[in-house]
C-alpha cells in the first residue's frame, strides 16, 4: 500500500504528515506500506527517475494520502493521475482534536509533536489494516 505525505515545508502539518508516514512505514506496518515520493509523483514523466512507477503503483495498489493542510495537494495529484486515494487523512483535524499536544515548531516537533505524530500514525495503521482485510 502506498502512502503519500504532504511535502510542504512551510506548515507544521507538513512536518507532522511526514513524521507520521515514516512511523507507519518504518515501525507500525513496514511489510504492508511504502512511501511514494510526492514531488516525483506530481512531476511524472521522469522515467529515468521512476516518475511513472510512482503513478503506476498508485493505480495498482491502494494509496493513502496524508494532507498537511486543507489544500489537499497529495489527494488532488493522486485523483488526477492514478484514481481516487483509498483514504485521506488531514493533519489539521488531528491538531484540532488534540489541543494539549503542542508541537514546538515545524523544524522541531518536540515531545508533544512526536506524540501527535504517533497518534496520527496509529490511525493510519488502522486504516491500512482495514484496507487489507477488504482486499
Where are the model-predicted features located?
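Iron-sulfur-associated redox domains of electron-transfer enzymes in respiratory
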Residues: 1-135
Amino acid at each position: 500500500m502506498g502512502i503519500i505525505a504532504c511535502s510542504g515545508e512551510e506548515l507544521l502539518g507538513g512536518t507532522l504528515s511526514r513524521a507520521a508516514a515514516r512511523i507507519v512505514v518504518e515501525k507500525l506496518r513496514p511489510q504492508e506500506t511504502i512511501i511514494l515520493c510526492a514531488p516525483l509523483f506530481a512531476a511524472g514523466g521522469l522515467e529515468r527517475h521512476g516518475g511513472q512507477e510512482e503513478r503506476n503503483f498508485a493505480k495498482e495498489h491502494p494509496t493513502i494520502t496524508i494532507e498537511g493542510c486543507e489544500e489537499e495537494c497529495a489527494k488532488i495529484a493522486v485523483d488526477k493521475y492514478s484514481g481516487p486515494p483509498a483514504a485521506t487523512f488531514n493533519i489539521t483535524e488531528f491538531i484540532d482534536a488534540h489541543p494539549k499536544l503542542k508541537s514546538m515548531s515545524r523544524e522541531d516537533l518536540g515531545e508533544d509533536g512526536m506524540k501527535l505524530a504517533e497518534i496520527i500514525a496509529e490511525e493510519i495503521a488502522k486504516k491500512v489494516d482495514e484496507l487489507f482485510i477488504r482486499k
